[in-house]
Amino acid sequence: MTGNRVRYALLLTVGVLAVAPFAAAASAQTIHVVERATTDAVTNGSKQDQAGNVLTWHNKIYDAANKKRIGRDAGYCIRIIVGKSWECSWTTYLEAGSIGVQGQFLDKGDSELAITGGTGAYAGASGTMTLHYRNKKGTAFDFIFHLK
């Protein structure tokens, strides 16, 4: 009987390990939203762009078509390289829960940030978020969350 238990436990373990990659792949999700940057404020320094400046905001979030308001976000960045990049941390709040991100925000071009977790439907979230400028003024951004 002990031999059968060992075989059963081994088969069960192998079965779980074989299915695990498919379960993870099935739970992968992409969420595309738009941030309208209307409250951004740079503080903690002169009016010049300089390392150490702090950017803060609490903006509204819209669906991918930029029509319907579906949430909000709030966060901060610290200027690291003048004219090039910020180091940021923020949370996007949606009806099903929140998603936290952290990483480098570039002054030009797309940025890729790490998803650091979430709440509600996004509890334990990981993956990356692509941030894309919708216009040259920097008043609207696509947030494309690639959840694992």
Q: Which residue ranges define each predicted feature?
A:
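Bacterial N-terminal signal peptides
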Residues: 11-21
